[in-house]
């Protein structure tokens, strides 16, 4: 596995691959790998000739006061994981290489970015879309792989690829969970023992909504109220950022569950901001 820090060097390599008919897969990450990241790399490895994993804690997607400086990092450990997973390249640029002095070009998807996480984190998806567009232009992938835990991010990036006619397929991989149901996340290390004990209730609340739909309930206000009541009892230290039932593609809130519907939520628990989602049908 090559470790590359220069955008220009990466682009030259990937352009040679593309001209030679090589199928490249891109796995964008911010590092501090867990089994969820490994599942993305394994998915890419099975479907491409070459796999590029990017490891970049992207400052453009952090708002002032967020955890950019505190975000967990372990470059040597992550390199071992990426190599073991079969990555051909680990791309680890410095911020000044991706955003040199005078950088002033941004990619925004206003509609899909406005609700859910976008409402609470202004500018977040502008940073995500911009860095992913740059990574795609550097690597020229046929396939890009993301986790479904960040469902809104997946929907936004698919819209970007469609609107810009990018010759890339964007695939989502299922959420990888701890044995108690908590979605794996690099930020879970922020949780205290007591917060970690409560954290699985986020997912259990979503399961309650799914079970109610299976039992015939269709009113999303009733479903959301039931989830909030469950959290009140089992996640008392959590502070809800949002809880919505939306169409999985448009992310528009639904009044009734009549077809495809996803329950998406974000809860702050101590220093951690936990997100999760679950298809209700």
From Swiss-Prot:
This is Pantothenate synthetase. One of its GO terms (molecular function) is pantoate-beta-alanine ligase activity. The keyword Ligase applies. It comes from Oleidesulfovibrio alaskensis (strain ATCC BAA-1058 / DSM 17464 / G20) (Desulfovibrio alaskensis). The keyword NAD does not apply. Coiled coil: none annotated. It is found in: Cytoplasm. The reaction proceeds by a bi uni uni bi ping pong mechanism. Beta-alanine binds at residue 61. It is an enzyme of class 6 (ligase).
